[in-house]
């Protein structure tokens, strides 16, 4: 039996095989290459980087837009007339795409570090291109459908900017090995590091301030009660808000067909009542064309248990679920009585009925009558509508005049307005300080996230309207606040550490490159051994080597005819019999 022994033994490289196999389906050793990547593959790497960066921004947008998820779903409902949580498929697709591209990015960077040729598998190329096109489509859709929400990105950077800078610095420093290998050849790559080191010069945040200048904690107003804990605009919702220590209650008021002010946000009753069961032919009619008796007969809680708009029903007790199912539409008079009994203020917006409505011209007086007939003090009511404001002030002088229009201070004083209710995108720190200095209070809406509440707190607002008073109740202090000196120290320290690490990597890379180049100059092909593993010499191995030598002689320069030409030049020639092989040497001995 002939014993066969491999001439060349390779070291197993399972990790490298997995790396190149998953990225480019190159599982075999002979498929891998250390050659420079082709321009085509470099182009696909660029597309992969673009997809990853776009998804990074897209993910950040949806992370910060969590404050307004309900607003997004409400806009979808107004367009489709069907209530659904549209954020779930978007978040699932975004998370999947980001995870996929991030994984491919890591594999690509590992290829670069190990000097492997980039060769993205064709299936990956199709998926990456599909992800890129889908994300671009999503960005265009949001820009058309929800354009105002882009402001949340700019505002959130005031809060997250210092930490994003440190995170980006850490990532670039961690990738210093790859960057250093490029900077050795292309010095302009160092511009990226220089920009990162100087970014804090352009970062400004209201939370970078002395703690002694921090104002009092902003009061929290229950916007439509506590709609995450109970159906919006119901007595149960306002009661839940009062349990969270809110200072005021906010509502949207509509006038019924018989002149009764009641609480309703939507134009129709379809979303928040069972009007489709009791009045199916009128479910798309304007809510103001129902009389109070019809409105009172509707359930205002079953929809909450069915749709679960905030994913909170599973945490409700059985008692609260039964109570929710029995909720009815709340009138303005009921809200005023509840506020008077608990010594809370009330702020509401008033919607004018359509032209065909019998109370189209009487809607303001209907609301004033409800206020005057209740037991609430006039100074506890914050009047927002701009219509007939002078007549309202004359009829009830003690009402707190509030406006949702950002006007100059002089004009606000002329109208007798003492409080501004602004969207958070309009609440700039400089304007807030200006209004506060003129004794004009600022109320900001909607504020549902601790980070946004902290930002408004540091900006100096007096109150915020929130759908989540139970969450803001757990924020006794701003999430973070630091002085300019503290931030400067953190900035300089992190930059110095990064510079030291990157310089160390650069020096090591340069020395390593020079060492390899010096090794190339002393390279001798004869030093290459046929076997990577040392084995004890055997007769079989010697015979195999002898056969290889003779085959090379017969196929190449070893023929007698070719070698005979060199004898005239004084060069020695050898015949096959003159070659002393290890086997012949052993036989001779």
Predicted segments with their positions:
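Phosphate-group recognition and catalysis centered on beta-loop-alpha active-site segments
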Residues: 1-589
């Amino acid at each position: 039996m002939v014993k066969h022994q491999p001439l060349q033994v390779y070291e197993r490289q399972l990790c490298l095989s997995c790396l190149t196999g998953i990225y480019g389906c190159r599982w075999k050793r002979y498929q891998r290459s250390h050659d420079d990547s082709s321009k085509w593959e470099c182009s696909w790497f660029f597309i992969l980087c673009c997809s990853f960066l776009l998804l990074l921004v897209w993910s950040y947008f949806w992370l910060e837009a969590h404050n307004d998820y309900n607003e997004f779903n409400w806009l979808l409902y107004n367009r489709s007339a069907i209530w659904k949580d549209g954020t779930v498929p978007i978040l699932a697709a975004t998370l999947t795409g980001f995870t996929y591209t991030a994984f491919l990015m890591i594999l690509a960077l590992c290829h670069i570090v190990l000097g492997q040729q980039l060769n993205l598998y064709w299936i990956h190329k199709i998926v990456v291109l599909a992800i890129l096109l889908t994300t671009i489509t999503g960005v265009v859709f949001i820009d058309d459908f929800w354009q105002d929400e882009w402001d949340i990105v700019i505002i959130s950077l005031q809060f997250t900017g210092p930490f994003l800078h440190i995170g980006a610095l850490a990532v670039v420093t961690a990738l210093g090995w790859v960057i250093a290998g490029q900077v050795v050849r292309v010095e302009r790559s160092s511009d990226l590091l220089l920009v990162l080191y100087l970014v804090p010069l352009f970062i400004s945040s209201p939370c970078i301030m002395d703690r002694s200048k921090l104002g009092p904690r902003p009061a929290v107003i229950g916007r439509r009660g506590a709609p995450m804990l109970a159906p919006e605009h119901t007595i149960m919702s306002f009661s839940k808000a009062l349990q969270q220590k809110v200072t005021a209650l906010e509502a949207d008021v509509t006038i019924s067909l018989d002149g009764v002010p009641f609480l309703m946000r939507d134009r129709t009753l379809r979303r928040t009542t069972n009007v489709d069961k009791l009045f199916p032919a009128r479910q798309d009619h304007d809510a103001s064309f129902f009389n109070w008796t019809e409105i009172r007969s509707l359930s205002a809680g079953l929809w909450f248990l069915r749709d679960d708009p905030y994913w909170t029903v599973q945490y409700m007790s059985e008692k609260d679920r039964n109570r929710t199912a029995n909720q009815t539409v709340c009138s303005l008079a009921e809200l005023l009585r509840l506020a008077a009994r608990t010594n809370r203020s009330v702020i509401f917006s008033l919607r004018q009925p359509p032209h065909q409505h019998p109370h189209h011209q009487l809607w303001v007086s209907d609301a004033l009558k409800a206020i005057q007939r209740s037991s609430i003090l006039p100074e506890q009511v914050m009047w927002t509508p701009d219509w007939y404001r002078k007549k309202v002030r004359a009829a009830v002088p003690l009402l707190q005049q509030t406006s949702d229009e950002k006007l100059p201070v002089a004009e606000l004083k002329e109208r007798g307005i003492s409080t501004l209710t602004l969207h958070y995108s309009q609440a700039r720190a400089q304007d807030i300080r200006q209004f506060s200095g003129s004794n004009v209070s600022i109320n900001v809406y909607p504020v549902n996230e601790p980070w946004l509440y902290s930002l408004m707190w540091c900006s100096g607002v007096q109150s915020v309207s929130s759908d989540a008073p139970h969450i803001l109740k757990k924020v006794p202090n701003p999430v973070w606040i630091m002085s300019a000196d503290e931030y400067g120290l953190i900035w300089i320290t992190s930059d110095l550490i990064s510079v030291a690490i990157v310089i160390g990597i650069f020096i090591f890379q340069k020395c390593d490159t020079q060492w390899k180049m010096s090794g190339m100059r002393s390279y001798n092909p004869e030093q290459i051994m046929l076997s990577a593993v040392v084995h004890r010499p055997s007769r079989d191995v010697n015979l195999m080597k002898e056969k290889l030598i003779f085959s090379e002689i017969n196929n190449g320069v070893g023929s007698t005819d070719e070698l005979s030409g060199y004898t005239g030049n004084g060069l020695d020639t050898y015949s096959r019999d003159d070659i002393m092989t290890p086997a012949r040497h052993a036989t001779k001995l």
